[in-house]
Amino acid sequence: LDEKEYDEYKKESKTMGTNYKERFNDSLKMQKYLRASERRANIIKNASAKLDAVKTIFKERNDMSYGLMYCNPGQIDDVRELCTNNSPNPIYVRKITEKNTPTRKERQVIMDAMIRGDYHALLAIKILDEGWDCPELRYCILMASSGNDKEYVQRRGRILRKFSGVYPNGDKKTRADIYDLCVIPDISGFSDDEVAMEVALAEKEFKRMRQISDSSENPENCDSIIKNFYKQISKSSS
């Protein structure tokens, strides 16, 4: 988080921490907790550092074809601009939002067009929550992650499905790359109640990370990254 985002995050965390223990016994405290939680979640969802991470992914991948960039509403236009301005090779995307969600028949037309090379990737909101299987995809950038275990497993599964077809260059799908962008804020200086709450919330992030690590080709590398994140938050909470 940048300085402004962190200040806002800490402010909402303080409100949540104040109402954390008593929220189940006091409806007003629960209301304050939930409102602050929603505002804070939006700070995490739209963290500017995620855009920096996307830029890094663009640089690291040699080919941006057959992909999905799963965005938050607040960042989809920013990501589209990054794609357009990607140098030396612009990334052409098909933008899909809740307002223009395609029918089942239109979905296959869109995927066929991507396979032909009409565009490199789908830039979408909630596409993985609409029962849309995407076996053709070779990579997915998850800027918007779900804290719901069932939803997350479904989203991951749609990308990892086998593709029986062949790409125009003759290649077959043998793997899929999933980039799950996680935000673990610094909690040093937080009160005991705030720390307890933050650690509990961070555990959900770590659980999701471990789920994807277990399905990866490089679980050792993933586990090492997860352990480093865990050390950071443990150090901040001590």
Regions found by a protein language model. Give the residues of each.
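Interdomain hinge/linker at the junction between the two RecA-like core domains of SF2 helicases
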Residues: 1-11
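Active-site-adjacent beta-strand anchor residues
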Residues: 2, 68-72, 142
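Hydrophobic packing residues within well-ordered alpha-helices of enzyme cores
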Residues: 9, 79-83, 131
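Conserved RecA-like P-loop NTPase helicase motor core
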Residues: 92-217
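Short, flexible loop/turn segments with low-complexity composition
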Residues: 218-231
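Non-catalytic terminal extensions of ATP-dependent helicases
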Residues: 231-238
